[in-house]
């Protein structure tokens, strides 16, 4: 089990990092502006939640990386006993998630004991690290407001490639991602087809060296680590689990240097399963 960062350690470095304001406003921070996400997948969430009568001990909130858990063998292997609920939507930024859990009412009928949040990578092209961290904080605060007893695991934003820096050209990556994104946009994606598309990308393996990874992500993670209070909110950065011994990002784990392969999802599951168990037990004792 990977150790959760103690609150004391987080406090010790708090003076060295930017401060998250108590109340982030959309006028001051575009990453907390709620972005309408009234699309078929969101509507499907509401139907499934209603049909299951809100069943589920843990919810996963995020973007296409979380969305991609669907159809993965590792999903049931690692989390099946928790009756997990996948609330990931491809292309989501922090503002989309904020809309979904407020105006979109995705949490209304759910009674989760724990939540896993991994969001922010889609903000990196337009927002600062401070703004993105503010968006993540706003999601955490909204979760706490709606579900006072919930325990929250905030994951550091996963490492990813920068622009124009992979061994494969950006044209290759873009062309490989297009059909994946198109399939994910469908109300009911064809999982077999998605897996075939990912395998095609996996055949073009390469590694992005550490020096060429997106530089904004470590900055975001430094700031959101401060959200860990050791009681309700816990922070964990599992980014190193996806890297090789030199800190590079292998294509066999992230075929397009952003989305995970089946191996990548297994790594993710192994890295947080024990943490989820711990958070659910904490909730049960209260």
Region spans (language model):
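Conserved beta-strand elements of the Class I
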Residues: 59-61, 85, 115
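Solvent-exposed, polar/charged alpha-helical surfaces in well-ordered, non-transmembrane soluble domains
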Residues: 87, 95, 99, 130, ...
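N-terminal secretory targeting modules
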Residues: 1-61, 65-78, 145, 175, ...
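Oxyanion-hole/transition-state-stabilizing segment in secreted/luminal serine hydrolases
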Residues: 67-83, 94-169, 206-207
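Acidic/histidine-rich helix-loop elements
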Residues: 28-36, 86-96, 257
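N-terminal/domain-start segments enriched in small and hydrophobic, helix-friendly residues
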Residues: 36, 95-130, 248-249, 254-257, ...
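Active-site flanking residues adjacent to catalytic metal/cofactor-binding acidic residues
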Residues: 61-63, 155, 236
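Catalytic His-Asp segment of secreted/periplasmic serine-dependent ester chemistry enzymes
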Residues: 161-286
């Amino acid at each position: 089990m990977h150790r959760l960062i103690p609150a004391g350690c987080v406090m010790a470095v708090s003076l060295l990092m930017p401060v998250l304001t108590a109340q982030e406003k959309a006028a001051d921070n575009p990453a907390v502006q709620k972005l309408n996400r009234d699309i078929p997948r969101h509507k499907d969430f509401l139907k499934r939640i209603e049909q299951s009568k809100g069943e589920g001990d843990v919810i996963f909130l995020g973007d296409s990386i979380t969305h991609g858990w669907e159809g993965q063998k590792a999903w049931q292997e690692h989390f099946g006993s928790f009756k997990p609920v996948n609330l990931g939507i491809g292309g989501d930024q922090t503002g989309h998630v904020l809309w979904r859990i407020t105006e979109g009412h995705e949490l209304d009928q759910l009674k989760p004991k724990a939540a896993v949040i991994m969001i922010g990578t889609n903000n990196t092209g337009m927002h600062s690290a401070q703004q993105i961290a503010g968006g993540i904080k706003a999601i955490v605060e909204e979760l706490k407001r709606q579900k006072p007893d919930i325990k929250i695991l905030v994951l550091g934003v996963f490492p990813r490639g920068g622009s124009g820096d992979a061994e494969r050209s950006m044209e290759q990556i873009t062309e490989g991602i297009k059909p994946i994104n198109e399939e994910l946009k469908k109300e009911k994606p064809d999982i077999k087809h998605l897996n075939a598309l990912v395998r095609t990308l996996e055949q073009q393996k390469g590694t992005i060296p550490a020096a060429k990874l997106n530089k904004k992500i470590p900055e975001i993670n430094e700031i959101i680590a401060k959200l860990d209070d050791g009681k309700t909110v816990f922070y964990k950065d599992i980014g190193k689990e996806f890297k090789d011994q030199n800190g590079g990002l292998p294509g066999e784990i992230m075929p397009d240097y952003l989305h995970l392969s089946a191996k990548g999802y297994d790594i993710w599951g192994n890295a947080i399963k024990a943490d989820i168990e711990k958070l659910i037990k904490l909730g049960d004792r209260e």
